[in-house]
C-alpha cells in the first residue's frame, strides 16, 4: 500500500498541497539530490532520508521515506565504504614513478577507449593485465553490450598478464601486496581540454570499496596542475581533485565522475582493479 513519488515538479506550495492529499499513506519520495530546495522540502514535510540512488547516466537521486503506519519500518545498515567516492590512501616512491615514466615512451600506441563518454576520443589505454593476451584489449567483457557479447561468444576471456607486464617488474612487485589483482592498465587523457564526460560505471557489478569488491586505484605517473577530476558524492555534492604524481587514490567508479585535462601534456595514470581486502580494505574504512 505504499505510495511512491518518483519526481517533484512545479510550485513548492502546489507540491505541498498535493502531498497533503495523500497523508494517509506510507510514502517513498525520490528527488534529484542536487536540487537542495526539493531535499529541504522533503525534510520539512517529515520525510526521513533513506539513502542515494545513482543512475547509469551519472544522476544522484535522494530517496526519502515517510511512515503513517503504527508499525515501524526498518532499513538495512549500509557499510561506510558505500558512501565513499574518492580518497587518497597512500603514496608511491619517486623511484617507482621515475622507472615507470622512463619506459612510457617505448610503449605502442594507446587504444581508444570505446565509451559514450569519450566522444572526442581523448581517453585511451593499454593493458598490462586483462581478459585477453593482447595489450590493446582494454575492456571488461561483462561491461559490454549484448550485441558485442553475441559477436564474441566464441572468444575465450580470462584474466591474464599481457607481454607488456614483463616490461614493468616494479609494477608487479608493487601489486604483490594485494591479495588479488584483476585489470591493470595505463590510462591516458589527451591535453588541451581532453575530457572523459560525467558518467558512472554502474554496469560493473563487481566494483566498489566494500570488502570483497573490486577497488579502483589510480597512481598518476604523468600529469599537470590543470588535470582535474570531479567526483560527486552520494548527496550530489561535487568535489574537484587534482591527483598529484606519486599519489595513490581510491575512486569508486559507481559514483559520478568526470576528468578534464586542460594542460599541455598527456595525463597517464596507472589504474589497478584490486579486491578490497586486508590492508587495502582497512585503508578505505580508517
Question: Which residue stretches match the model-derived regions?
Answer:
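Conserved metal-binding segment of the jelly-roll/cupin
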Residues: 241-256
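A short beta-strand-loop-beta hairpin characteristic of the jelly-roll/cupin
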Residues: 220-244
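A short hydrophobic beta-strand segment most commonly corresponding to one strand
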Residues: 215-220, 248-250, 264-281
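Conserved acetyl-CoA-binding loop-helix of GNAT-fold acetyltransferases
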Residues: 7-21
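Conserved catalytic-core motifs of GNAT/GCN5-like acyltransferases
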Residues: 30, 48-62
Amino acid at each position: 500500500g505504499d505510495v511512491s513519488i518518483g519526481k517533484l515538479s512545479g510550485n513548492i506550495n502546489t507540491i505541498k498541497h498535493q502531498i497533503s492529499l495523500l497523508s494517509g499513506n506510507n510514502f517513498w519520495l525520490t528527488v534529484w539530490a542536487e536540487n537542495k530546495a526539493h531535499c529541504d522540502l522533503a525534510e520539512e514535510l517529515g520525510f526521513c532520508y533513506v539513502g542515494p540512488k545513482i543512475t547509469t547516466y551519472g544522476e544522484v537521486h535522494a530517496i526519502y521515506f515517510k511512515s503513517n503506519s503504527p508499525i515501524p519500518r526498518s532499513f538495512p545498515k549500509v557499510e561506510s565504504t558505500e558512501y565513499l567516492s574518492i580518497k587518497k590512501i597512500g603514496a608511491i616512491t619517486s623511484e617507482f614513478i621515475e622507472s615507470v615514466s622512463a619506459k612510457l615512451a617505448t610503449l605502442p600506441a594507446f587504444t581508444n577507449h570505446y565509451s559514450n563518454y569519450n566522444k572526442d576520443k581523448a581517453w585511451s589505454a593499454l593493458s598490462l593485465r586483462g581478459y585477453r593476451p593482447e595489450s590493446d584489449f582494454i575492456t571488461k567483457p561483462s561491461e559490454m553490450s549484448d550485441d558485442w557479447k553475441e559477436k564474441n561468444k566464441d572468444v575465450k576471456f580470462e584474466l591474464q598478464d599481457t607481454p607488456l607486464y614483463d616490461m614493468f617488474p616494479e609494477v608487479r612487485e608493487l601489486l604483490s601486496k594485494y591479495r588479488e589483482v584483476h585489470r591493470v592498465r595505463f590510462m591516458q587523457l589527451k591535453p588541451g581540454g581532453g575530457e572523459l564526460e560525467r558518467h558512472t560505471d554502474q554496469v560493473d557489478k563487481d566494483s566498489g570499496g566494500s570488502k570483497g569488491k573490486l577497488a579502483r586505484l589510480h597512481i598518476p605517473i604523468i600529469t599537470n596542475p590543470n588535470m582535474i577530476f570531479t567526483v560527486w558524492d552520494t548527496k550530489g555534492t561535487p568535489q574537484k581533485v587534482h591527483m598529484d604524481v606519486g599519489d595513490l587514490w581510491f575512486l569508486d567508479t559507481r559514483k559520478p565522475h568526470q576528468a578534464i585535462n586542460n594542460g599541455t601534456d598527456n595525463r597517464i595514470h596507472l589504474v589497478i582493479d584490486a579486491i578490497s581486502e586486508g590492508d587495502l580494505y582497512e585503508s578505505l574504512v580508517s
